[in-house]
Amino acid sequence: MSDRLVVDSLGVAFGRTEVLRGLSFSVPDGARMAVIGPNGSGKTALFKALIGALPSTGTIRWAPGTRIGYVPQRLDLERDLPLSGHDFLHAKATLVQASEADVTRALRLVTLGRDVAQRPIGSLSGGQFQRLLLAFALLGHPSVLLFDEPTTGIDEPGEELLYATVERLQREEHLTLIFISHELSLVYRMAGLVLCLGRRGVHCFGPPRQILTPETLERTYGAPMDHYLHHAHGP
C-alpha cells in the first residue's frame, strides 16, 4: 500500500519554544491513525503544520492530488448569530466552488437532515454541530480527514452517532483518517496506527494493541496509566 503522508524530521516552534522536534512517521493511504499525548505535547500544532497553517522545518510530503478536510476541536464562531447550518455550509461552498448538490451530498453523508440544517446553529446540539463541521470539511471532496478531538462537548449518544458516521465515511469514501484523541477506548476502536507524543518527543508509533503498553503510556503522559489501559480494553 502506498503512503498518503510522509513526515520527516518535522519541527515546530513558537518563538524560542520548541513544540515539535525531529518528528518522523508515515501514514498509508486509507489508514486510520490516532495521535495521543498530554496537553502541550504538540498534537494540534502537528495538525496545523500538516495543513500549512503553521511554519515548520523538516519535510511534509502528501501524495499527489491529496485534498485535506480539517475538523477543528472548536470553531471561533458566535453560536447566537442568526445563521442556519445550511447558510454556514453555503459560505464554505462559495470558497471551494462547491455546488448546491455538493452541500446536499455533505449533509447526507453526515446524516444531518435538511430540517436540522435549516435551524439556527445556536440551537444545534453538540453532536449535531460537530456533524455540521464534518459536512463543512467534506465539501471539498477530501481524500484525507484531520479530526481534532472529535467528541469534545458531546454527550454519549452523540458520540456514538459521530463514531459510526466517521467509520462509515472512512470506508465508503476511502478516506485516510488522522485524529487526535484523549480517549483510549476510541483509539482502540478506530485506529490502526497510533502516534504517541510526549513533552520530550515521540514515545511510540505503530498498531495500538502492540505498542500501548502501561510503560509506553507512562512515558507519554508522565504518570501511570494502568486504569485507563484497562478501561480502554473493556471489563
Predicted stretch roles:
Residues S181-H182:
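H-loop/switch region of ABC-family ATPase nucleotide-binding domains
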Residues L145-D148:
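Catalytic Walker B motif of ABC-type/P-loop ATPase nucleotide-binding domains
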Residues E100-V116:
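Conserved ABC ATPase "signature" region
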Residues E160-E172:
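Helical segment within the ABC ATPase nucleotide-binding domain
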Residues V194-P207:
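H-loop (His-switch) and adjacent beta-strand-loop-beta switch element
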Residues P120-L124:
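Conserved ABC ATPase signature
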Residues P208, T213, R219-P235:
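ABC ATPase nucleotide-binding domains
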